[in-house]
Structures are given as C-alpha cells and as structure tokens.
Amino acid sequence: MEDLPPDYQDQDLPSYETITNTASTAVAPPTRSTLGPATLYISGRFIYSTDPQAPPLYEFSHSIGYLHENDRSVKVERVDQVVKTSAGISQVVLRNRHLFDLKHPTAAEFPNFAYHAEAATRRVLCSFGASTFRVGGILRHGKGYRFERAVKGADRKLEAQDALFEVNPSRDKAVGYEWRDAQGELIAREVKDEMASMSLVITAEMSAEMRDALVAAWIIRIWCELSNGDHSAMRLMMVRFKTVNAVGYAP
C-alpha cells in the first residue's frame, strides 16, 4: 500500500463545488461527477480557463515557463471557490487544495521514473510516473510520452501499474500533442494560439479527479521538454494579458 496523508476532514472543501457555511450549519453541496470540455492555458504559476472573469483553476509552486533540470519538486494545488455566509451576507472566497507533488529525482536516487506525480491526498486519482518513447520513422520522428499509474514498492520507489495517458506528436501543425486515455480515446490536444502560447484543449468529458491528473501530467510533459532544452516550450512565457480580480491572483 502506498503511504498517503490522512484524508480531508469534513471541514475541508469539496471538489469543484461550493458550500454554504453558517454559524450553526454546513449545507452539503450537490455532487458533480463529470466535467465537460474546456480550454486551459498557462500564465506564470497559474492555469486559467478561457473565462476572463474567472479566478485561476490551479496554482503551482513554480512559474511553469521557468522550470528546468535542477528543479526537483513542484507543488500542485487546485483553487476551489467557496461561498461563505455570515450574518446573512454571502462572500466568495478562494482556497487551495493540495493535490500532487511533481517530482524529478536525481540520477543518484536510481528512480524508476525521471518524472512522476505523488498524490498528496487520497481524493486524487492516483500517483503516476512518466516515460518517453520515440515515434515515427526515418523521415519523420519525434518523442511521445506515456503516463502510468504507480504505487510504491518494497524499496519505497514508485512502480508502474496500469496505463493512464499516452501522448503523441500531432500531424496537424496547429496542434503540438494529442492526449489519449487508457482506452486509446482522444481526450485533449495541445494547441498554439495567436500569441504563440500553449493551451490544453480538453475535448472529452471526464471526472474532476481525471482532469486534475491530466493537468498535472501536462505540466510534467512541459517540464521534461524544458529540462531537455526544447526551446519551443519557452513560448509558455509569452502569455496573454489577464485581468486580475480583487482576490489578488496575478499571472
């Protein structure tokens, strides 16, 4: 069994939902098992949707465009919106939920994965590791990425289990990579917009936990490119202007 922190208690936040708190009661939110298609983009340490009025969806401990080979750990948090009611006045506040720690161990640690994501709570889908493979032939070749569910073995290192995602370069020049799930179904594409920044266009419905894992895997793939000197990944530092609302999050 993999060691994980204790599960969240009742006072912690539900996934992608709001909860109304009063001085005496807390009303449980309705469940939402599936999230629809969406487009996500990176701005500094944050991931946003395309809604210009919305707060960030995820926050990272590092600015994503500046990740490099010497970085060893990146904290991934989801930014949840919570509605609090006090004295009859409702207020929306943001709270961060720690999801994953993205890891890049040194070669001296003899890791099974050069990059992996460790679950920070039992509420995420799983821990998983990343590996690469070559695709294409003599005239056209590239690098693909494979993400596998992982658990800690007897040596405390993550060991590969079932497939989670597979990522391949796209034949479409406007698309960088295509993401498929364990069943081989297309679930997302990485595309370049008019500002040459990279976005993840999620085309399939999925659970909130699956989307959290997909976002974490996306950042691992980008981190791997940046660590290997892929200059095309530096376009991540070219981001669109984002109107910052009163909560104080800035790109």
Placement of each model-derived feature along the sequence:
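Short acidic, low-complexity intrinsically disordered linear motifs used
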Residues: 1-26
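Cationic, beta-structured binding surfaces that engage anionic biopolymers and membranes
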Residues: 20-244, 250
